[in-house]
Amino acid sequence: MAARRVLKAVLVDLSGTLHIEDAAVPGAQEALKRLRAASVMVRFVTNTTKESKRDLLERLRKLEFDISEEEIFTSLTAARNLIEQRQVRPMLLVDDRALPDFTGVQTHDPNAVVIGLAPEHFHYQLLNEAFRLLLDGAPLIAIHKARYYKRKDGLALGPGPFVTALEYATDTKAVVVGKPEKTFFLEALRDTDCAPEEAVMIGDDCRDDVDGAQNIGMLGILVKTGKYKAADEEKINPPPYLTCESFPHAVDHILQHLL
């Protein structure tokens, strides 16, 4: 492990890293307290599109995580930012619980398609409506393209397969705004006043969390919780800076070796 400049910021994934649905990863709350006691800024980054930022924050606080809304950067926020920049009227293929994060966005007579994780809306009629909009030239905005995610009952399809289906059917390419896009990580770091080389990312997804972060110069720590499967660390090049059992182990390493 190469020597690094002093670490200034830690980005932490949420689902699969700190919690799995309504259960915290064992020891995660105490580990977060120890990390906060160190001379480092902590931010939370997530591709979760199943609920609004406020609902997500409420879930985390019920699990006794000490987190403020300003510390969370979500792919829903990144999607809204792009919608406003492009001044489009999106067809929102997102979970109903995520809609509060799009309050005020004009959706009448849509001229764009925004797709996140929306299991109840991924049926033929709505997907075909999106298909026709794309054929007419509407841009496709993917909140993220995760292949799958972890639920209490096992792994489940993410939005990625549905985004890819629309890309294939319409011969178009989605603009992706969430992890592992470089712009997502840079936006998440913007208020920390530190360079990517002065930050580390902790997550359970080797591609979206670790590879995405390392591609902009951050360190990437892969945890074996959430969606992690055996040998995931061998799927990316370069491999993760560190692969460890869980978030508390990642915090131990940071406190002992990076600060």
From Swiss-Prot:
PANTHER family: 4-NITROPHENYLPHOSPHATASE-RELATED, HALOACID DEHALOGENASE-LIKE HYDROLASE DOMAIN-CONTAINING PROTEIN 2. It comes from Rattus norvegicus (Rat). GO terms for molecular function: enzyme binding; metal ion binding; phosphatase activity. The modification N6-succinyllysine is found at K50. It comes from the Eukaryota. Binds 1 Mg(2+) ion per subunit. Belongs to the HAD-like hydrolase superfamily. InterPro entries: HAD-like_sf, HAD-SF_hydro_IIA, HAD_sf, LHPP/HDHD2. The keyword Magnesium applies. This is Haloacid dehalogenase-like hydrolase domain-containing protein 2. Residues 49-71 form a coiled coil. Disulfide bonds: none annotated. The keyword Kinase does not apply. Substrate binds at D13, L14, S15, T46, N47, K179. The gene is Hdhd2. One of its GO terms (cellular component) is cytoplasm. Keywords: Coiled coil, Magnesium, Metal-binding. Mg(2+) binds at D13, S15, D204. NCBIfam families: HAD-SF-IIA, HAD-SF-IIA-hyp3. It holds the Pfam family Hydrolase_like. Its cofactor is Mg(2+).
